[in-house]
Amino acid sequence: MQGLGALFLLLTACLTLKADNVPTLPDIQVQENFNEARIYGKWFNLAVGSTCPWLRRIKNKMSVSTLVLQEGATEAEISVTSTQWRKGVCEEISGVYQKTDIDGKFLYHKSKWNATLESYVVHTNYDEYAIFLTKKFSHRHGPTITAKLYGREPQLRDSLLQEFREVALSVGIPENSIVFMADRGECVPGDREVESTSFARARRAVLPQENEGSGSEPLITGTLKKEDSCQLNYSEGPCLGMQQKYYYNGASMACETFQYGGCLGNGNNFASEKECLQTCRTIAACNLPIVQGPCRAFAELWAFDAAQGKCIQFIYGGCKGNGNKFYSEKECKEYCGVPGDGYEELTRS
């Protein structure tokens, strides 16, 4: 197989793209005297390059993952298990790849998109690194090619990184579509990632200014940014006013109301639910259920439907919802990583 199961997942993302300007795929030669038994075991996916245009859009979300290759249930199969961070959660994905009459070449057929993937082990010394190339053929959308670099350890020699770059370029992958991924460490399936403040701020910044809540200035001064206050408990302050405000509840991942006295307090204090969500919501909200709430307002909003893997419209009642609530389709896609059909496949390594 192109054993590295991640390859087919990247390629299927391009099934929704037109094949305009995609070059004819080159012939690929497998590793000379390929030894299948020696390719088994654990690998780290360290770099990727592809003619699939979606890669450039989501490359900053990709990180080093692990992949284990083993003998399959039959002599004609190879078992593949990939573990990676995706949308803040550690996921484990398993697959089966079919051997061919060429040692080092493997097939995977994705019936949902009527696409066949051909994967090739093109360079490896088995004990240190491996480079895979995968062709994807779609009857509707034409061909794409993806290259991936794997290592037995999370770091490799610079000369091997350069070799991978040269291989990718040689098959028509653009320089700006070659990504050496960040190492966030190994994960255990089901674990949730602790999102750093700087990463969260950078992610939220993708929303254009006109889509963000206007809101008021922070209620306290100093070096603390508004978004850094999101994990604080709400504070009514010492004054005796009765202003309804919103605060972000990290436990429920929702913005809830409280009575603000009118002075002091802290930065977890927002004039509207929209401003609160657009300041404090994290990518974990995309995994929450879609909740209309018990109130009877009629607001047409957007939410991410995890079952369908896309953003959909729903009617929000106006109260007691959660963070999976967006004020435009664009905002939903920016947060939940849905630039187009097939995005989910692309983000899996």
From Swiss-Prot:
Question: What does the UniProt record tell us about how this protein is modified after translation?
Answer: The precursor is proteolytically processed into separately functioning proteins.
- Residues that bind 3-hydroxy-L-kynurenine: 52, 110, 136, 148
Which SMART domains does this UniProt record tie to the protein?
A: KU (SM00131)
* Residues under site feature: Inhibitory (P1) (chymotrypsin, elastase): 240-241
One annotated GO molecular function = carbohydrate binding
Glyco sites are at: 114, 214, 233
Give GO cellular component annotations, separated by semicolons: cell surface; cytosol; endoplasmic reticulum; extracellular space; mitochondrial inner membrane; nuclear membrane; plasma membrane
Every copy of the BPTI/Kunitz inhibitor domain together lies at 230-280, 286-336
Q: Where is the signal peptide?
A: 1-19
Which positions does the site annotation Inhibitory (P1) (trypsin) cover?
296-297
Q: Which InterPro entries match?
A: A1-microglobln, AMBP, Calycin, Kunitz_BPTI, Kunitz_BPTI_sf, Lipocalin_CS, Lipocln_cytosolic_FA-bd_dom, Prtase_inh_Kunz-CS
Superkingdom of the organism of origin: Eukaryota
UniProt-listed GO biological process terms: protein catabolic process
Q: What class of enzyme is it?
A: oxidoreductase
Q: Does the keyword Transmembrane helix apply?
A: no
What is the disulfide pattern of this chain? Answer: 90-187, 230-280, 239-263, 255-276, 286-336, 295-319, 311-332
List its EC numbers. Answer: 1.6.2.-
**What are the record keywords, sorted?**
Cell membrane, Chromophore, Cleavage on pair of basic residues, Cytoplasm, Disulfide bond, Endoplasmic reticulum, Extracellular matrix, Glycoprotein, Membrane, Mitochondrion, Mitochondrion inner membrane, Nucleus, Oxidoreductase, Protease inhibitor, Proteoglycan, Repeat, Secreted, Serine protease inhibitor, Signal
List the Pfam families hit by this protein, alphabetically: Kunitz_BPTI, Lipocalin
Tissue-specific expression: Expressed by the liver and secreted in plasma.
UniProt lists the family membership as follows:
In the N-terminal section; belongs to the calycin superfamily. Lipocalin family.
What is this protein's record name? Protein AMBP
Biological source species: Rattus norvegicus (Rat)
In the UniProt record, the gene name given for this protein reads Ambp
